[in-house]
From Swiss-Prot:
Compartments, as annotated in UniProt: Nucleus; Cytoplasm; Cell membrane
Region spans: Heterodimerization: 25-101
Subunit structure, as described in the record: Heterodimer of a catalytic subunit (PIK3CG/p120) and a regulatory (PIK3R5a/p101) subunit. Interacts with beta-gamma G protein dimers.
Residue numbers carrying N-acetylmethionine: 1
InterPro entries with a match to the protein in the record: PIK3R5/6
Alphabetized UniProt keyword annotations: Acetylation, Cell membrane, Cytoplasm, Membrane, Nucleus, Phosphoprotein
Source organism of the structure: Mus musculus (Mouse)
Activity regulation field: Greatly activated by G gamma proteins.
Protein name: Phosphoinositide 3-kinase regulatory subunit 5
Location of the region described as Disordered in the Swiss-Prot/TrEMBL record: 381-413
Span list, region Interaction with beta-gamma G protein dimers: 646-746
UniProt GO BP: G protein-coupled receptor signaling pathway; phosphatidylinositol 3-kinase/protein kinase B signal transduction; phosphatidylinositol metabolic process; positive regulation of MAP kinase activity; positive regulation of phosphatidylinositol 3-kinase/protein kinase B signal transduction
Positions where Phosphoserine occurs in the chain: 451, 500
GO cellular-component term (any): plasma membrane
Amino acid sequence: MQPAATTCTEDRIQHALERCLHGLSLGRRSAPWSAGLCLNCWSLQELVSRDPGHFLILLEQILQKTQEVQEKGTYDLLAPLALLFYSTVLCTPHFPPDSDLLLKAASTYHCFLTWPVPYCSICREMLTFIDAELKAPGISYQRLVRAEQGLPVRSHRSSTVTVLLLNPVEVQAEFLAVADKLSTPGQSPHGTYTTLLLHAFQATFGAHCDLPKLHRKLQSKTIEELEDIFTETTEAQELASGIGDVAEAREWLRTKLQAVGEKAGFPGILDTASPGKLHTIPIPVARCYTYSWNQDSFDILQEVLLKEQELLQPGILGDDEEEEEEDLEMDRHCAERDSLLSTSSLVSHDSTLLLTSSQASEPVLSRQMLTTFVSGLSDGMDSGYVEDSEENSEWPQKPGSQKRQGHRRPGQKFNRFYKLLKSTSQLVLRRDSRSLESSVDPTLPLRRAGSLCSPLDCPAQLPSRAQRSRSLPQAKLTTQLPRWLLAPPSHHQRRRPFLSGDEDPKASTLRVVVFGSDRISGKVARAYSKLRRLETSHPILTRFFKLQFFYVPVKRSHGTSPSACPSSLSQASPLPADSLKYPSPTDLGMAPWEDSTNDISHYLGMLDPWYERNVLGLMHLPPEVLCQQSLKADSRPLEGSATQLPILADMLLYYCRFAARPVLLQVYQTELTFVTGEKTTEIFIQSLELGHSATTRAIKASGRGRKRLGIDDDREAVPLTLQIIYSKGAISGRSRWSNLEKVCTSVNLSKACQKPEELDSSMEALTLTLTEVVKRQNPKSKKGFNQISTSYIKVDKVQIIGSSSCPFAVCLDQDERKILQSVVRCEVSPCYKPEKSSLPPERSFSQPAETGSDLCSLLCLPIMTFSGALP
C-alpha cells in the first residue's frame, strides 16, 4: 500500500506542476479564458507544504521539466521553473545527506549559461544560490526572514520594509481588509527568533533534531538569550557559506551549531541517535506598513524613516568600517558632494554646506543585502552610473582560524600615503567649508520653497532663498526626523546608484507596492519623477534604501455601495484597525468613478508571462475568493509557528519576495501653454486625452453638475481646428516629421503596444488617435452633428496647437484630478532624467538631433516583475 500511496502523491504533485506551467508560452493568447489560473501556483504550494517529504518530490519533477526545457529549447518555461525551484528549496525543511538534488540542479543550470540574457543571468544567480545552500543549509531562508523582520546581527544589518499604498475610495473593501491584516504585527520578536533557530537547527541536523523539545526549550529562554544564540548561529552560517569546500563547510557548520546548542543548554536535543520527524516551518509574514495614498508624490515614504530609524541609525559598525572612518576622518568636510543624481555639482555643494551642522556626522551604516537568486536588479537600468570596484566584503574564516583583528585591506596603506600627499588647496577648501558651516544656524528648520504643507499659523518670516532647503517635501515631517538622518552623507560614504544594478550589497530594501488601475500608474510615474528630483539635491531615502516598485492591478471600484472597512482618509497615517465606513464618491458629492483601463498591467503581462499568471490574473477572480483561507485546517504541531493568511495575502508576499527584475516603462512629459501665456510641465505614462474626450471626463467627474451640463458624444461635439506636428521614429534612430491641420473632436495619445505581436524593445512609441470630422451637418430643425473618422498613427513626439488660440482641455492618465482647461498648445515628448530635464523642449521639435547620451538618459519607471522583459 505504501508504494501506491507514494505514486499517487507523485502524480498529484506532477499534475499540479503541469497546471502551473500550462499556457505560459508567448504564443498563449489563443485561450479565451484565464480565470483561476492564478491559483495554480498557490495550490501547488499548499499541496506540497502538507508534508515535508513532498518538497523533495517536487524538486525532482522540476529538474526533470528543466532538462526537457533544455532539450526542446522552450525558453519561456525556464524562468518559471527556476522560480519554482528557488521557492521550493527555500521552504524545504532538510536535505538528507545522501540526497544529490542540489548537485544535479547545479549541473542542470550550468548548461544554461550559454543561453541569452536574461536566461543566463537567472541561471548564474541560481548557481550562486545553490552553492550557498550546499555549504550552509537554510541560509537563504535565514537571510530573507532576517531582512524582512529587521533583526540586526552585528555586521549583517540589512532590512527589508514593505509599504502598501492604496486609495480606499477606489479599492474594494476586501483588498483593504487584506492589506490591514498584512500590516497588523504578527509574531513577536521572541517568536521570530524561535522560528529562525528552529529552522537553522532542523536544516542542519534534519530528523536527528528533536524539534518539539527544542521548541519548548527556546520558549523558556528570554529574548536576550535568544538573541545571543541567534547571533552565534547566524555568524556560523555566514562563515560556512564562504568556505571553499562543500563537505568541509557542512561539517564545520554542524560542529559549530552543536557547540552553540551545548552552550545554550540543549543536551540530547541536537544530533540525537534515533531520527524523529521533520516539520514544515513556513516563512513568517513580512513587516508591512499600509497607507492611504492618492497623491502625486512619495512624501509619505519618509515616514518609514521614522519607524525604521532604530535599524538605520549608526551604532553598530564592523571592524573594517571603523577603520575606514578613522582613515577618512580628515576628509569629512572637504570636497563637494558628488551626488549620483545631482544635476549640478554647484547646487549639490551649496545644499550640503547649508544643511551640515558641526554636530552632524554620519558613520557608514552597516547593512547586508539579501544575496539570493532574486536579489539583484537586471542590467540596463536608467541610472547611467558606474562605480569603482572595491573589495568590501568580509571574507569568511576557515574552520579553526582565529577572528581577524586589525586587518586592513591591501589598498588602505596606499590610501594613507595618498592622503598625506594631498595638496594644501584641499586644506584651504576644508577651512572654508568649516567657516561657512559655522555661519549657518543649526536650529533653522528645513523648509521647501512654496510648500503647501507649511503651517499657516507660523509667525516667523520665511528665510531667504539661499537658506531654504529644497530637499524635503514636508516641513512638519522634517522637524521629526533626527539630526543624524538629515545630515548630508560624509564624503567617505560609498555612493550608490539610484535604482540600479550596482546597488550597495549592504543596502536595505524598501518595497513600494501600489494597487490600482492606469490612473494610479500615472500617479506613480509623477511621484517617481519628483522623488528623483528631490533625491538629486539631497538624498534621504536613497541613502538608506534600495527602492523597488511593485504594481498590483485592481478593477476600479465605483463606490456605489457602502463597504465595511477601516476608515481614515489621512494621507499620512496607516490605516487603522477599526471597522467603519469609507465615504464613496457619491457621499462626497461626486459622480461614481468612470472605469479606468489596466493597459499598463497587461503590457507587463505580455513581457513577463509569470507576472500575467500570478499578479494580473488576480484581477479576474472575485474578491471574496481571494480573501478565503486554506480549506485545510492548520495541522502544524508547533504553536505560533505561522499565521494563516488569505490567498491574496500569500500571492502578494510571493510577488514581493520573488519578483526581482524590473521592466522599464517609458515616462512622457507634456508642456502645456494656456490662454494666459503661462506654461507648465506635466508627467504621464499611459494616456493623454485632449479635446472632447477630456471634457467628457471632466463633466462625468463634476458630480451633480453633470446633469446640468449633459454629455454629448463625438458626433455632437463642437469640432476643433488643430495644427498637429508629429515625429515618427524608425529603427535606425532617425525621425520623420509631419505637419498637418485637422478638424477634430478628440485627440488621444496612449502607449502603442497593445498586442503581443507589437512587442519591440527598440521601438518605444505612442499611438496618436485622431477623431477627425469629415463633414459637419447643421440642419435648421435639429442639433448639428458630425460625420467622423478615426485614424491611428504611431509617434514618438507630437505638438498640438489650437488654431487662432482655440482653447481645449487635457486629461492625463484618465485622472479626473489632472484635467487642465484653457490649453492652447500641447507638446509631448519622452521624459528625461533630472540630469537632462533642463534641456528646452523646443529643441526636440525644431531639429530632432539625438545623441547616444540623450537616448541613455530617458526616464523610465521600473516595475518589478519575475523575469523582466523576455526576448
